[in-house]
Structure formats: C-alpha cells, structure tokens
Amino acid sequence: QFGGVPCRLYENGAMAAMVVYHHGGGFVVGGLESHDDICAEICATTGYRVVSVDYGLAPEVVFPGCFNDAWTAFGAIAAAFPGRIVLAGDSAGGNLAAAVAHYARGRIDGRITGQVLIYPGLGGDRGQGSYVTHATAPQLTVADMEFYQQVRSGGTPPERDPRYAPLHDTDFSGLP
C-alpha cells in the first residue's frame, strides 16, 4: 500500500525511474491482477520500478474517489522513491495518469518526467471526430462510454473539472 491505497510494486535490477501504472476498465472493473502481466512486462523490459495502483471502483466509489486514490498513492510513492516518475495507464487508467500529471503542477514539481497514456479517456467532444466515426465500434461504443460516465460520476458528471476529464484543463504548460 502507498498512502493507504492498495498497490503492487515490481522491481528488477537498475532503478533509473519509477513507472506509476493505473489500470483500465472504465472505472468499474480491473485491478492489480488484471494488469499484472502488463506491469511485470514494463518492469522486465525497462528495468524500471513499477507501482500498479488499485484505485476504488464505481459504483461503490464515485468521482472524485478514484482520482483521490490515484493522487494519494502518487504522493506517497513520490515521497518514498526519489527520482524520475513516469505516469502511465490504459483507458480509465490513462485518464487518471493524465489527471494526476495536471494536478501535480505546482504541488509536486519536477518529478514527473513523462506520461504514457494508452487509449486514454480524456474528455473530448463526443459529437465530433472519432467519437462519431467509431460510435458503434465493436469493443467500445459511445453508448458504452456514456454508461461508464454515468456510473463513475454517480449520475452527475462534473462540469469542466480536469481531475475528471484532463482535456477540461485550460492550461497545458509545464506538463511532461
């Protein structure tokens, strides 16, 4: 645990940097086990330490609960391990990695040296672009995304909150 948030630490050889990984799953499924192979592979391939963060899931935990877990774990990880930190995640986890990077500016400066966002949900306009072109994609439809948003938010998505949707931030300066 880091900051009281369940986490799993992977270590292998030289520890030049730390990767803090947030799993995907639409904020409703996933955890330390579902993404164990990904985190182990990142550690084995890069030699970096990897911490997998097991944030609370909806509907039991609604926004900002999952963000608070990610932020609390990040703060404890940053305090425990000096050096470079790369924030990473897939899907919902990519959202959390980006949200933590935005929120860290002015709070924990200079530690985050990169973001690896794998098909992240960042809060784009669902009325245009690939949201329209791929609205009925076989793996994840726009209707699925709307469902996850309603469950994650407890039925009321926040307006313009970059902790919820990082693209709602008005300042992208100082981000890795």
Model segments located where?
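Alpha/beta-hydrolase superfamily serine-hydrolase fold, recognizing
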Residues: 2-176
